[in-house]
């Protein structure tokens, strides 16, 4: 079986196992809500379009709900760009070589994070926020590198 046949077989496996992803003969796929996963960043995502769900290789999109007080572990995406849209609420993004910059992203705003920039979202508000996160890779965990040397910054933030 050729390359496309193999992808189709993998996709049918996803359909049978998760009943979340639908595939037409032309390769157009629908991802329904319900699948979740925890990333190396220490936060739980609602799985969306990715290599694992639809076979995407160059782009992925996931939903990141963050209850009040939740923070990501500092990290970079080596060679991968990130765009994030704040669907609901607001959140502070710590970014820079030492997480020295803080940007408050509010509902309806978008932010671009260039490749290799250390960053970590931290919901300092008293309400849940929801991000739509897009990466220029088939999976948001591709080339993700934890910057553990920066963990202390968020652990000690605010006293």
Where are these regions (language model features)?
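Short beta-strand His + acidic residue motifs that chelate non-heme Fe in jelly-roll/DSBH
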Residues: 73-75, 93-94, 102, 113, ...
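A generic "binding-loop/recognition-motif" signal
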Residues: 68-70, 79, 98, 117-118, ...
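Conserved short histidine dyad/triad with adjacent acidic residue
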Residues: 49, 62-78
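Ligand-binding loop in jelly-roll beta-barrel domains
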Residues: 106-107, 115-141
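A short, N-terminal "cap"/entry segment at the start of jelly-roll beta-barrel domains
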Residues: 1-58, 73, 146-159
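Conserved hydrophobic/aromatic beta-strand scaffold that supports enzyme active sites
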Residues: 61-65, 83, 102, 110-112
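A short beta-strand-loop-beta hairpin characteristic of the jelly-roll/cupin
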Residues: 80-107, 117
